[in-house]
Amino acid sequence: MDEQRDTTDRFLPRFDAAGLVTAIVVDADTQALLMVAHMNADAIEATRATGQAHFWSRSRSALWRKGETSGNGLTLVEMRVDCDQDALLLRVKPAGPACHTGRRSCFYRRVEADGGLTFLADDAQG
């Protein structure tokens, strides 16, 4: 089955024991990393059907559409799958900040050698 996933032209996601795949989300225009989330089969189907990014919330155990409360949705441009189909790359057009903190990206802090965190000026809150 693994060889088939590597060479097939069919979408056959390999879900983990919790029924999830990792989804890496980048801005389709800038290629900036926006967020990492998880998707189950329902989230993948909803995203493909609506063109809006949906994810599975592990903390709430619920399907959610990015932006359903904030208005900062993610319009799908392209969905890619990695070689063994256990991770997805979503190229999106964001309607606002991707992070719940109001920042463009969830990756706004750099981990320093001493274990401290440096806030990155190029990803200030909007």
From Swiss-Prot:
Record's GO cellular component terms: cytoplasm
Reaction(s) catalysed (UniProt annotation): 1-(5-phospho-beta-D-ribosyl)-5'-AMP + H2O = 1-(5-phospho-beta-D-ribosyl)-5-[(5-phospho-beta-D-ribosylamino)methylideneamino]imidazole-4-carboxamide
Superkingdom, taxonomy of origin: Bacteria
Binding site for Zn(2+): C83, C99, C106
Keywords, sorted A to Z: Amino-acid biosynthesis, Cytoplasm, Histidine biosynthesis, Hydrolase, Magnesium, Metal-binding, Zinc
Cofactor notes: Binds 1 Mg(2+) ion per subunit.
Family annotation (Gene3D superfamilies): 4.10.80.70, Phosphoribosyl-AMP cyclohydrolase
GO molecular function: magnesium ion binding; phosphoribosyl-AMP cyclohydrolase activity; zinc ion binding
GO BP terms in the entry: L-histidine biosynthetic process
Pathway(s) the chain acts in: Amino-acid biosynthesis; L-histidine biosynthesis; L-histidine from 5-phospho-alpha-D-ribose 1-diphosphate: step 3/9
Compartments it resides in: Cytoplasm
InterPro entries in the record: PRA-CH, PRib_AMP_CycHydrolase_dom, PRib_AMP_CycHydrolase_sf
Annotated positions binding Mg(2+): D82, D84, D86
Enzyme Commission no: 3.5.4.19
Cofactor: Mg(2+); Zn(2+)
SUBUNIT field: Homodimer.
Functional note: Catalyzes the hydrolysis of the adenine ring of phosphoribosyl-AMP.
Family as reported in the entry's similarity comment: Belongs to the PRA-CH family.
HAMAP family linked: HisI
Protein name: Phosphoribosyl-AMP cyclohydrolase
Organism classification: Bacteria, Pseudomonadati, Pseudomonadota, Alphaproteobacteria, Sphingomonadales
